[in-house]
Amino acid sequence: NENLYISNEQFIYYFNELLSNFKIEFIYPTHDDIANFLAKNQIHIKAKVITSSIQANHISRFKKETYYHFKNYDFCPIVYSHESKEIKFPVFLKPNDGQGGKEGFVADNFNELNFYFSKYKNLIITEFLPGEELSVDCFTDFKGNLLFIGPRTRERIQMGISFRSTSVELTEEIKYIANTINNNLKLNGAWFFQIKKDSHYKYKLLELAPRQSSTMGVYRHSGINFALLSFFNAQNIPVKILKNEYPIKLDRC
């Protein structure tokens, strides 16, 4: 139904009609554009949107906003302008409003850089990060307390989604990044971020999103039910995290 695309001018009217007909009271957005749209329009929607603030959704949706917001922290990657003569190759190019590594390219020189800019609009240029990549699943309660940080691998990627992922140890470096993000954005409920090591083996921030990720199910097997926690949290019901301490590997076709 074309009326139920957020690009449709009548979307909110038809969406509210659907919510009323099916007596839906809570919405879990699982796509960045939809989460951003619903957060901005929560006042017009006849159900509770389980996501973070408008600020957190906007900053996390656009890479330029994300990197500008965290530019004073050492985990923010180097960002170049296309006109800069100081670019250190190789560099990584990606859409400002992209996700999951889609339409991402490595450029080894100015010719390749200009080629990609001639074919794709709205690209940003960052330093190339050659090291290990992780997703980090988090949960922040309605009081702003970061209650859970769960790093996991991205071993097999399809469509920008981790189809094989293993829980790994939480280090002080990852904990610092998570707490810094949480202290700088108005986050509420489940959220996640992705990091990758640079040439000096330090993690740099790739992206973040104030929603549930596709592979948060890794930690569901450790007792962390992000969906249920977020449901209680959306109603200002205090929750506690009880994690089973054993490694988990998730693999799917």
Model-derived segments and spans:
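A short glycine-rich, hydrophobically flanked beta-strand micro-motif that places a catalytic Asp/Glu
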Residues: 188-200
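ATP-dependent carboxylate/phosphate-activation module, predominantly the ATP-grasp catalytic core
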Residues: 126-186, 197, 209-235
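Peripheral (often C-terminal) accessory segments that flank ATP-dependent C-N-forming ligase machineries
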Residues: 228-253
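Protein kinase-like catalytic core scaffold
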Residues: 91, 147, 204-207
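A short, GP-enriched loop/loop-strand-helix hinge that lies immediately N-terminal to
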Residues: 22-61, 74-79
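Active-site nucleotide/adenylate-binding loops and adjacent lid/helix of ATP-dependent enzymes
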Residues: 54-131, 141-145, 172-175
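Active-site regions of enzymes building and remodeling cell-envelope glycoconjugates
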Residues: 1-5, 46-50, 91-94
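Glycine-rich, highly charged phosphate/nucleotide-binding loops
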Residues: 1-18
